[in-house]
A protein has these predicted regions:
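Cationic-aromatic interfacial patches
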Residues: 199-244
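Short, solvent-exposed loop/turn elements at domain surfaces
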Residues: 131-134, 196-200
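Blade-terminus and WD-like Trp-Asp/Gly-His loop motifs, strongest in beta-propeller folds
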Residues: 39-47, 83-92, 199-205, 240-244
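C-terminal closing repeat unit and adjoining cap/tail of repeat-based domains
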Residues: 91-96, 225-228
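A short helix->beta-strand "capping" segment at the edge of beta-propeller domains
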Residues: 175-193
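A flexible loop/linker signature enriched in serine peptidases of the S9 family
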Residues: 1-15, 20-35, 46-62, 68, ...
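Conserved blade-ending motifs and adjacent loop-strand segments that build the rim/top face
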Residues: 72-84, 188-198, 228-243
Length: 244
């Protein structure tokens, strides 16, 4: 949670201990009325990610390790990075970033009103050994293996084994491993055009994100499917949403 002094706090419910995670000291003119933006947990609850404003008035994405109490900046501050969120499998960190937000930093005049801010969507490959979500795909067709099932019993056994494996996978805790060395070289852009994006949330194999379109009520909720590497409209006229 945050307070009026722009601190982000972490409360251990079991012990009642409260820890200051970070402070958004350079965001004292935050028009949203809050401090550090959109803190989100990793799937294993070992990391917390958030965006905060830097001295140059650009936001950057950070991750905080609960066990060490150390916060690490992920983006370089040359673009305005906001709304970082972990993928459900803990392999990636997604965020939206803008390189034309500087014309909107000023707040005292109305000259910035006709300069809409656009953002691109990015994914950070957190583990150095993990594959990029947009690695080149092979165009070779898979060869169907010859079946050595002599009876229906073997097929049933295989089905039961697969069901057991799925249950075990579903119950297993997905560890989020972050290699900070060279992490800036593992940031890749999603193949979507620059738009006024906001409201990033993740589901299994998907990224949901809102798009503000001029002269339309609410925002358009889109979903990006990583398996197909395609985006599609999920709903229109959305005022708010959340994923369980």
């Amino acid at each position: 949670f945050t307070d009026v002094r722009l601190n982000l706090w972490l409360l251990d419910v079991a012990s009642g201990k409260m820890t200051v995670v970070d402070n958004d000291a350079h965001n004292n003119l935050n028009t949203s009325g809050g401090a550090i933006e959109s803190p989100r947990w990793s799937p294993d609850s070992r990391w917390l990610t958030y965006a905060k404003r830097l001295p140059g008035q650009m936001n950057a994405a950070f991750v905080y390790e609960v066990s060490t109490g150390r916060a690490t900046q992920i983006t370089d501050g040359m673009s305005d990075a906001v709304e970082p969120v972990f993928s459900r499998d803990g392999k990636y960190l997604f965020f939206a970033a803008s390189t034309n937000v500087a014309t909107n930093v000023g707040w005292l005049d109305m000259a910035r009103l006709d300069k809409p801010v656009t953002r691109s969507l990015y994914a950070v490959v957190l583990n150095k050994d993990a594959a990029s979500p947009f690695a080149p795909e092979s165009d070779e067709e898979a060869v169907k293996a010859a079946s050595d099932d002599a009876s229906g019993e073997k097929k049933d056994d295989k089905k039961d084994d697969k069901k057991t494996e799925k249950k075990e996978d579903a119950g297993a805790k997905k560890e989020t491993k972050i290699d900070f060395a060279g992490i800036s070289q593992r940031i890749v852009a999603l193949p979507v055009p620059d738009r006024a994006y906001a409201g990033l949330q993740t589901a299994d194999g998907k990224l949901f994100y809102g798009e503000f379109i001029p002269n339309k009520p609410g925002f358009t909720l889109n979903t990006f499917e990583f398996k197909d590497r395609k985006s599609s409209v999920y709903a229109e006229g959305v005022s708010n949403y959340t994923l369980s």
